[in-house]
Amino acid sequence: MVKDRVIELFRQALAKGAAEGRWPALEASFSVEAPRDPKHGDFAVNAAMVLAKAAGKPPRDLAQAIAAEVRAVDAQHEIAGLEVAGPGFINVRLAPDVWLRALGRVVAEGTAYGRTEVGRGKKVIVEYVSANPTGPMHVGHGRNAVVGDGVQSLLRWAGFEVTREYYVNDYGAQVQTLARSVHLRYQELFGRQVTMPPKSYPGEYVKDVAAALKAEHGDRWLDAPEAEWLALFRDRAVEHVLGLIREDLRAVNIEFDRWYSEKALYESGTVDRFLRFLAEKDLVYVGKLPPPKSKKGQPAPAQAASNSAHDLGEEGIAASDDLTLFRSSQYGDEVDRPVKKADGTTTYFCADIAYHWDKRQRADALVDVLGADHGGYVPRLEAALEALGASRKDLHVVLIQMVNLTRGGEAVKMSKRAGTVVSLREVVDEVGRDATRFIFLTRRSDAQLDFDIELAKRQTLDNPVFYVQYGHARLAQIFAKAREAGAPVPEFDLEAARTLTSAEEQDLIRRIVAFPDMLAAAALAYEPHRVAFYLQETIAAFHSYYTQGKRTGERVISADARKTAGRLFLCRALKQVLANGLGLLGVAAPERMESPETRDLADDV
């Protein structure tokens, strides 16, 4: 990467100056970033500002000295200019050939271009989706799935060893409610009149499970006590729903390396071992809510106690119960959290931190992709990890805001098929996998997303995924035209590349070469939307360049063989970056596209 080369030159210069006693060794890291205004150069370096205090020198004076040392170590003359600016930044302008050789590496590396080793040697578990196995996936789950898959893909491209994990909530009240819903439908199949309770599951899939159980067991469970049929009906229902969820995920091309069962967490003894571990570390005690005084000796905030009691109410716990409480307030949480109820059963939080305890033993870092409504849950998990001897920084939570589904600007709230919330499958069936995946990434995950079904179906340039894919197809057709004109797609030629001198061509070169840095930064920030933004902005720059060339006569293919070779190579590098970026996001990069709006795909190239 070009940026890495700038960093290396500055490190050499700083080390040489320190060895000669002109300034102390730089212990902290310094930044190398592209300035917002290209007039200020290719990169701005803050090394002098970081080192100034230790060196006992004004940052600008130190910057001048460092710049001189960088010039001295730049034996290959890769830097065309260094200028001290502002409070002590060093603005760097690279020699043109540095950018052109970097462009050559795009094609040389091909499908691997953009991969880095930022995370080499580090194991990460990315847990995403983890929708309760009580029904098919809705569009909110779909956004979680696509964002989570984008995060894991970015981390793989950055060199991390990634495990994709789905936590199956197949233990507890919700799956028991599902089992009872199936049993009611099972009774219906024998002609009985039943009333579905308000919290039951009404979907057609419940009837399917009931029908399968009837076919296999007849009326065996019709009048049997609940204790005899509950586990069977629960397991069959969960198995069936997980099958539906897997199909939904395959529809958007998402697979997991591991499906981690909450039930297995209990059956394997992991939860019991975890509780013993907490007791041995004196991290739990028996008490009541509101919790005892916090670490600073002050009563816990009334609101925090109230919130805790409210949360517990959902698990059937009263504030007056004797509970086994985890000392989470000692680690930054608002209140101590219960891990065991008065009746001896464990809480959801207990299983969740036991699961994170298990994950942390298998990986160096954890990424949880959660709905935005879980934001208040995050401090509890962080406190738990810290109490268990890990670092809060070992856990990163990506929050997913809701999706507002619209059709031509009108809200779509109900499914035509099920009479409930719209399922992910319905959206994918109507607009396609590529549009679904890409549009879910057209906004930050922590911002609400408006998903217009009609826009997603359009084969027009106002559809963001069509716009990017059309750019890739346009490039493919340019090469087809070039072959017809007897101008084969060239290998890298520095002399031909030196003809790429226009401002638009230079801008495209810098955008293309920035691809690996962008991916690495997006991976470390867990933000796959950056890739979608980059693709849209980069192809917009190309469409503008292409259109202007047709208008001015500076077409890609011209009578000037050297210019043609240079421009075709630029197009080849851009096509590779688009394909890699789309592939990383799980979106196809078509070679040909046609719609009434794009029939002149490669005319007058």
UniProtKB/Swiss-Prot annotation:
Matching Pfam families: Arg_tRNA_synt_N, DALR_1, tRNA-synt_1d
Residue ranges of the region described as Disordered: 290-309
EC number: 6.1.1.19
Cell compartment(s), UniProt: Cytoplasm
GO BP terms, alphabetized: arginyl-tRNA aminoacylation
Family: Belongs to the class-I aminoacyl-tRNA synthetase family.
Protein name from the UniProt record: Arginine--tRNA ligase
Encoding gene, per UniProt annotation: argS
